[in-house]
Amino acid sequence: MTAKIFIDGEHGTTGLQIRSRMADRRDVELLSIPQEQRRNAALREDLLNSADIAILCLPDDASKEAVSMLAGNNNVRIIDTSTAFRVAQDWTYGFAEMDKAQGDKIRSARCVANPGCYPTGAIALIRPLRAAGILPDGYPVSVNAVSGYSGGGKQLIAQMEDESHPEHLTVNNYVYGLNLKHKHVPEMKAHGLLDRAPLFSPSVGRFPQGMIVQVPLFLEDLADGATVESIHAALSAHYAGQDIVKVVALEDSAKLGRVDAEELVGQDTMKLFAFGNPGTGHVNLVAVLDNLGKGASGAAVQNMDLMLSA
């Protein structure tokens, strides 16, 4: 049976990517609202309520409004890509590889909150260490990351690419979120199983897509006996048996001179690396992903496929 899918916000960066990924599929029927009609609330509500799955690619407030339009209609399942519901108790977090049971939870859920791009990498690195008891309570986790500028949506893309834009940017890299109140921190804490908020420092580079997320650690402050080998083993065990999150072998990581933020552009996978210096007791965990792939639209389509397989 063909599933009806409505992408609310299909003309934005994430919406366009999701639509493109489903353009040639015959198992789904894409319901669409013309761009000139996108502010027609009645038409939008009708399409939302006509779908089997509504994928919301909207700002937080608009997503909340869309969900309110579906109140009482349990026939429509929802995937929301905003930050509005990522720590809500009655929503399922849409990171299927987060633990062994998460894929089944997504499969049976009515409401799925698609993860943020930065949290996808951070949680992938942090949660297995918390689950294994390696990362203790109270540890001051810091997360440093750089994203391609497409993560800022159409406005930032225009600022980076259009030289005639009144706010054209010529910088190659900048740090933001300087007030340390980035909207992705709550989901990093909640789904990373942390008991205190991580210190998150995001930045943007002059490349369209791609992402690196880093979590530096001090071995002396981890569980007794922790080594880069035991950390790598915990990551490997956590993601064993699936093919989306790949943990790079320690011997292969040791041969690298650099890690490329753009390595997985156009792919929906993620790579995790563990680097260590036994002499200093320093470890650096690194995640590489496409911010619009596993970090956004790819994850949304993956979640949709899980929900359709129920």
UniProtKB/Swiss-Prot annotation:
Gene Ontology CC entries for this record: cytoplasm
Q: Has keyword Translocase?
A: no
Q: What is its main location?
A: cytoplasm
List the SMART domains. Answer: Semialdhyde_dh
Catalytic residues as annotated in Swiss-Prot or TrEMBL: 117
Q: Where is this chain's protein located in or outside the cell?
A: Cytoplasm
According to its UniProt record, the EC number is 1.2.1.38
Recorded GO molecular functions are: N-acetyl-gamma-glutamyl-phosphate reductase activity; NAD binding
**GO terms, biological process:** L-arginine biosynthetic process
Keywords, A to Z, come to: Amino-acid biosynthesis, Arginine biosynthesis, Cytoplasm, NADP, Oxidoreductase
SUPFAM superfamilies in the cross-refs = Glyceraldehyde-3-phosphate dehydrogenase-like, C-terminal domain, NAD(P)-binding Rossmann-fold domains
Q: Which residues form the signal peptide?
A: none
Q: What reaction is this protein's catalytic activity?
A: N-acetyl-L-glutamate 5-semialdehyde + phosphate + NADP(+) = N-acetyl-L-glutamyl 5-phosphate + NADPH + H(+)
Pfam families in the record, alphabetically? Semialdhyde_dh, Semialdhyde_dhC_1
Q: What class of enzyme is it?
A: oxidoreductase
InterPro entries xref list: AGPR_AS, AGPR_type-2, NAD(P)-bd_dom_sf, NAGSA_dehydrogenase, Semialdehyde_DH_NAD-bd
Pathway involvement?
A: Amino-acid biosynthesis; L-arginine biosynthesis; N(2)-acetyl-L-ornithine from L-glutamate: step 3/4
Name the domain of life: Bacteria
Coiled coil regions in record: none
> According to its UniProt entry, what is the function of this protein?
Catalyzes the NADPH-dependent reduction of N-acetyl-5-glutamyl phosphate to yield N-acetyl-L-glutamate 5-semialdehyde.
The entry assigns this protein to a family as follows:
Belongs to the NAGSA dehydrogenase family. Type 2 subfamily.
Protein name from the UniProt record? N-acetyl-gamma-glutamyl-phosphate reductase
